[in-house]
Design a protein with these regions (language model features):
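Polytopic alpha-helical membrane proteins, predominantly small-molecule transporters/carriers
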Residues: 1-147
Length: 147
């Protein structure tokens, strides 16, 4: 059940990510300075924490396919941060950008996962209903957000 706590932690972290990054970008008056700060945070959290957690014995037995896939996943995460910064730079605000990002991401995740691991049986039609409701939900969040 720990996974639920960690998933909630990720939701909280990413929920605050957009508004705080947007504020930092505005205060720095340069999106590339904000991206540099994101990169520094990624380094601190994404390199130093695992090094400490793995310890000297954990730095062995890396597989090529594991390294390639994990690095590609990390690069996609960093690319997502770059796209968010450019969305802000080009007039998007966190209250609009983040619902689009976090509404679209689960749909892409499920479609990609189904492509990589085709379902063994029939797909429940409610999956497609849920996917159709994502843009409706994002639209409602965007339209009715407090001003």
């Amino acid at each position: 059940m720990w996974w639920v706590i960690f998933a909630i932690g990720a939701a909280l972290s990413w929920g605050f990510y957009g508004p705080i990054l947007g504020k930092g970008q505005a205060l720095l008056q340069n999106p590339m300075k904000a991206l540099l700060c994101v990169g520094a945070a990624y380094f601190l959290m994404g390199v130093l924490v695992p090094l400490g957690a793995l310890g000297p014995s954990g730095l062995t037995k890396f597989t090529q396919s594991g390294v390639v896939n994990a690095t590609l996943g990390g690069a996609l995460g960093a690319l997502g941060a770059i796209f968010i910064i450019y969305a802000f730079k080009n007039g998007g605000v966190p209250a609009y950008v983040m619902p689009l990002v976090f509404g679209g991401a689960p749909v892409i995740n499920v479609l990609y996962s189904m492509w990589m691991h085709p379902p063994k049986g029939d797909i429940n039609p409610l999956l497609w209903v849920g996917m159709a409701l994502v843009p409706v939900g994002a639209g409602l969040v965007l339209y009715y957000k407090p001003s």
